[in-house]
């Protein structure tokens, strides 16, 4: 006889599902959402749906929820219906700009060390499985935070042993707060904190909801950005509205990598959620497809964010867009670091630049002489600059075309040290069953500055320098041999990890994971050798992730991430 067992997930502070008498909660008036979700999410007499009406999230957050419903609960929705649901919920139950800004790193897919300024014990509870970015880009009622905690425990039972039981923060730095009068249970503390700090109803969302309107983005924009491993980029982007809606656009861009001179042309589509969140793709379906996440400022004259690709979203530039109008815009000068006593050809990038045949209107400050103007276009100006032999060390602002660019150039007398960034990197083995996760390193040159002392506040950051790259063993145990198995680094500083899975050539049939030093070596004009290094952890793939960018289903004979 087969017994029937009932598993109940209990969470401290969990009350009955949303109190029908509460004033909180949003009516769901979108027929596709109601039709697709009402099988499990009940609708009350105010058109509020259980769970759904009591939270607000980013487009990525809503898309992850829809994907989870499809994957785990066999919700039958077409891709078009799923997109429609995400669009509706993101617009009607999204985040205000002020609410999202602290969590932009999450939606921009940045691998950073984030320091949560709130309760460190709650942070410790949450970051055992995901970043705090996942948390701070949501708003919920206190009951809904408790239900989310129960959902975690039901779907991922191991969290009880990882963080949800006992005082998980004991002994951790920053977790010494006075707990008198509080529950010592991590879940109680998290629910109370999150319900107070990230509630459903906020003044910011009330104000933005009343002010939200269709974005007016059509026109020409100048691009300035920076891609690790490639350097600064400059160009233009054209946005056009489509007939499919007031929040849908097409884009076409042309930009140049200033360091290499490589010119790139892209075309794509974008949607704007919640009135200010650009989500797009350029060159879709190709090997060089980029996903686009940008934050549109309130004046709709500027937007910024990240364009990225890669299995772990690890490749791509940071970008800033400024709308081109009648007034000239100067976005950058390359090269930026100019040595005393030398003449250098530089390119000034921007938009609506005036036709200039002499240097009388160009002002780079004291100690900088304007030479021959070799090219003058509306988006770039090529000119010869000579730095006086006795020019003062430091940054110079650029004044021209009734426009200003702060720290346009850096006057220096040589490179005194280099630094490898990031100081700590992470790559993921892959290529057999899971995709590889790459890590890009750069060497940044520094000058000691006016005081000629290393590591002081007046040091001058000179930008990327051309170095030779190599790996060294990060010795953690006797006979450590990680360097022989983890992977390799190329001349551009891009680390490629080895295959995932068991390696029979390695002692103990271990995986190709481990720690190494990434070493950069630079030879100065004077023949001195400068060296710097960074730590690299080569770890396992992400075996399970509800990734909103990827389809549900196998592809390319590789297992899903998610």
Where are these regions (language model features)?
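Electrostatic cytochrome c docking/interface patches
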Residues: 14-33, 72-74, 96-120, 209-210
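Beta-strand/beta-sandwich contexts
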Residues: 322-361, 405-455, 542-562
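The canonical Cys-X-X-Cys-His
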Residues: 34-45, 85, 122-134
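Short, well-ordered beta-strand segments
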Residues: 88, 448-483, 528, 532
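Central antiparallel beta-sheet cores of small beta-barrel/beta-sandwich binding domains
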Residues: 211, 215-299, 304-315
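Gly/Gly-Pro-rich "capping" loops immediately C-terminal to redox-active cysteine motifs
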Residues: 30, 42-72, 131-158, 265
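Immunoglobulin-like IPT/TIG beta-sandwich domains and homologous Ig-like subdomains
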Residues: 340-402, 463-466, 476-477, 483-486, ...
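C-terminal capping alpha-helices of c-type cytochrome domains
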Residues: 74-104, 158, 163-209, 520
